[in-house]
């Protein structure tokens, strides 16, 4: 038994006798702080924190028990497991954070318990003016403690200035190992900013006690949550697009210092490689190389960093190494050839008088071998031709379900616009039954690259699978002769954007609420079909919806980029043109296109419908629009737009993509509203 253990036993005996005497006079023992005779540092034997606190001495406040804390932790962890607001990268730190916050580890458990009992004794000693009898009793207690002090060999260890100055003891007053302050601040301010704020306010999690990072001491001997900042100081170049770059470059190509990522990116928890730093990175492969945010004339913009590509740096080394290897092989080959010639020359001197039989004059030219090789090449060529033929047959089989026409069956009437593949025309199609119908013709431009031709055929394969009354369906193709064409049903009233403008109050016309809902419902049902087939549109807008007679609306993607729509697209950091006014922040910043981003776009289309085709964020430049979307400056309600419809728009523009409604939910709501308006407009039905 060490000296601290012996002292605890002795102190406990003194307190026991003191408590007995005092208790006989009906004095509440809680005044003396005797609730917990086992001290405040306990060996953890629970289940919730077993993985991080097993067999550790943990601090338990005198007014609580280990069972109390265990029950609170169970309840709090149950809330966390069921929470849908918890990011996956944040969830892994939730339990260690709760365990370390509620039960920090005692650095010196025996000494901490010793000081606790000494404080209890000192606290009992200081009670005065209870009664004369009590004073006599207290004098006896003080005498007992004084005798013990004199006999104790470790008196200076206990009854000295080292005794904790506060009673009851707290996490701040004791010698405890707590969460590392730097990791706590990263958790609270960057990686789990939203989750940490919710936890602090939550009634169940708050009962456990979440650490206030500002009050944590700066101490190297602390409890680590395992949060690591991914940095490799030796990495001075990047591979591919730089999404795996972890170097320490923190200056843009123009020489401006990079800003800390957490200052500008709200969803930093999706990219844990960005926490606690301002180094150049390429999260989500947004750019072609590492980049960062910089300050530029009152606004923060994206700039690429001046970091070399690893392939460029090692190119010379590769060429040099390859040249050296080739040179070595040449030298070895020359040596072998020289030795063989020497041997042959020596052998020929011995047999030069022997008469050789007559032979084919081509035997030294290996004519037969050459012929065999030629035959082999021929067979190999036939094999490659066979593989290519099979590939074409497979491609042809995928196109068999589409009607095929010749250019003689198609008559081009007028140009409608121009897209990525080429021009789009209005025309006439002669069908097998000798009747003609009006069609929209999407023609592949002349001298298109191999990749463009492949993309064109790939689009045919994709579109051929789409069959819905609110999707513009392909009628057939022309693939036997250039120009290759896709043939679509022709929509008489043009695109929805033009239709809305031509029926707006500025043209002396208007649409009813029933017509607005009819348009919106058809688009939502078309998108519901696409999303059910895991198809992401990426460019849903009024300009890409077509209107036929009878107010039939169908979704298309003809890629019409006429001059009147050029302002709807914006080139972000030298990438392809993007319709930023219809895109959520995750698509603009990270190039993340999903069904949820299509839902955002549908909300903007709904806004276009009720504003009669007005351009979203009219009057702002595209860069200003990006800043507005990132700062959650949403479009205001159009004039005469029903509150319920605008509320649906707001839901579609939820910052967290998972909280946006599905197209099924949207269609159900619009259908209910449409039926209500229809019944109100036709009471006799």
From Swiss-Prot:
| Catalysed reaction, written as an equation | L-tyrosyl-[protein] + ATP = O-phospho-L-tyrosyl-[protein] + ADP + H(+)
Which residues of this UniProt protein bind ATP?
Answer: 416-424, 442
Q: Which InterPro entries match?
A: Frizzled_dom, Frizzled_dom_sf, Kinase-like_dom_sf, Kringle, Kringle-like, Kringle_CS, Kringle_sf, Prot_kinase_dom
Residues found modified as Phosphoserine: 131
A GO MF label: ATP binding
Q: Which residues carry this modification: Phosphotyrosine?
A: 565, 569-570
Q: Which GO terms describe its biological process?
A: cell surface receptor protein tyrosine kinase signaling pathway; central nervous system development; protein phosphorylation
Q: Where in the cell is it found?
A: Membrane
This enzyme's EC code(s): 2.7.10.1
Q: Indicate the segments forming the Protein kinase domain, all copies.
A: 410-677
Question: What is the annotated tissue distribution of the protein whose record heads this document?
Answer: Expressed in neurons of the developing nervous system.
Which EC class heads this enzyme's classification? Answer: transferase
Q: Which CDD domains match?
A: CRD_TK_ROR_like, KR, PTKc_Ror
Task: Indicate which residues are glycosylated according to the record.
Answer: 45, 63, 129, 144, 250
Q: How does it sit in the membrane?
A: Single-pass type I membrane protein
Q: Which residues form the active site?
A: 539
Q: Which family does it belong to?
A: Belongs to the protein kinase superfamily. Tyr protein kinase family. ROR subfamily.
Q: What is the name of this protein? A: Tyrosine-protein kinase transmembrane receptor Ror
Organism listed in the record: Drosophila melanogaster (Fruit fly)
Give the encoding gene's name.
Ror
């Amino acid at each position: 038994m060490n000296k601290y253990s012996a002292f605890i036993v002795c102190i406990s005996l003194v307190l026991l006798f003191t408590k007995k005497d005092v208790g006989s006079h009906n004095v509440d023992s809680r005044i003396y702080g005797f609730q917990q005779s086992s001290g405040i540092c306990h060996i953890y034997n629970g289940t919730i924190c077993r993985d991080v606190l097993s067999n550790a001495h943990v601090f338990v406040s005198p007014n609580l028990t280990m069972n109390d804390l265990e029950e609170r932790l169970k309840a709090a962890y149950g809330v966390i497991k069921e929470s849908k607001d918890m990011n996956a990268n944040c969830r892994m730190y939730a339990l260690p954070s709760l365990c370390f916050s509620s039960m920090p580890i005692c650095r010196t458990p025996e000494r901490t318990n010793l000081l606790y009992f000494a404080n209890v004794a000192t606290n009992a000693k200081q009670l005065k003016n209870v009664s004369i009898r009590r004073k006599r009793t207290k004098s006896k207690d003080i005498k007992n403690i004084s005798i013990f002090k004199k006999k104790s060999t470790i008196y200076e260890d206990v009854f000295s200035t080292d005794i904790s100055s506060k009673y009851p003891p707290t996490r701040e007053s004791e010698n405890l190992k707590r969460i590392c302050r730097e990791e706590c601040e990263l958790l609270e301010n960057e990686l789990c900013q939203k989750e940490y704020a919710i936890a602090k306010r939550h009634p169940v999690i708050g009962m456990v006690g979440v650490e206030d990072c500002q009050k944590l001491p700066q101490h190297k001997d602390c409890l680590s949550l395992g949060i690591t900042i991914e940095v490799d100081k030796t990495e001075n170049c990047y591979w591919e697009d730089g999404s795996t770059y972890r170097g320490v470059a923190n200056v843009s190509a123009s020489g401006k210092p990079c800003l800390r990522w957490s200052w500008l990116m709200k969803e930093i928890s999706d990219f844990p490689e960005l926490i606690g730093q301002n180094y150049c990175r390429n999260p989500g492969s947004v750019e072609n190389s590492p980049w960062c945010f910089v300050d530029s004339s009152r606004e923060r913009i994206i700039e690429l960093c001046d970091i070399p590509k690893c392939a460029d740096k090692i190119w010379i080394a590769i060429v040099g190494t390859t040249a050296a290897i080739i040179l070595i092989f040449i030298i070895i080959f020359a040596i072998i050839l020289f030795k063989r010639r020497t041997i042959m020359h020596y052998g020929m001197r011995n047999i030069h008088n022997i008469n050789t039989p007559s032979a084919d004059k081509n035997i030294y030219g290996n004519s037969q071998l050459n012929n065999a090789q030629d035959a082999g090449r021929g067979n190999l060529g036939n094999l490659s031709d066979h593989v290519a033929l099979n590939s074409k047959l497979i491609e042809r089989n995928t196109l068999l379900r589409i009607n095929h026409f010749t250019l003689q069956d198609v008559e081009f009437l007028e140009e409608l616009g121009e897209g990525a593949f080429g021009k789009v025309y209005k025309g006439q199609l002669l069908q097998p039954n000798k009747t003609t119908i009006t069609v929209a013709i999407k023609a592949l431009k002349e001298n298109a690259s191999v990749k463009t031709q492949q993309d064109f055929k790939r689009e045919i394969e994709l579109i051929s699978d789409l069959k819905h009354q609110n999707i513009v369906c392909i009628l057939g193709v022309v693939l036997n002769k250039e120009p290759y064409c896709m043939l679509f049903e022709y929509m008489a009233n043009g695109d929805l954007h033009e239709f809305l403008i031509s029926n707006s109050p500025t043209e002396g016309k208007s649409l009813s609420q029933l017509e607005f809902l009819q348009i919106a419902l058809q688009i939502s049902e078309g998108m519901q079909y696409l999303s059910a087939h895991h198809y992401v549109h990426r460019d849903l807008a009024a300009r890409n919806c077509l209107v036929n007679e009878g107010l039939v609306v169908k979704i298309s993607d003809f890629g019409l980029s006429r001059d009147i729509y050029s302002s709807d697209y914006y080139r972000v950091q030298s990438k392809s043109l993007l319709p930023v006014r219809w895109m959520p922040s995750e698509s603009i910043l990270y190039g993340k296109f999903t069904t949820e981003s299509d839902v955002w776009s549908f909300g903007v289309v709904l806004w276009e419908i009720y504003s009669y085709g007005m351009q979203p964020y009219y009057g702002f430049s595209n860069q200003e629009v990006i800043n507005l979307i990132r700062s959650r400056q949403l479009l205001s309600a159009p004039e005469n737009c029903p509150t319920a419809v605008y509320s649906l728009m707001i839901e579609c523009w939820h910052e967290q993509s998972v909280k946006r409604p599905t197209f099924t939910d949207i269609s159900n709501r619009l259908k209910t509203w449409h039926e209500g308006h229809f019944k109100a407009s036709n009471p006799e039905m």
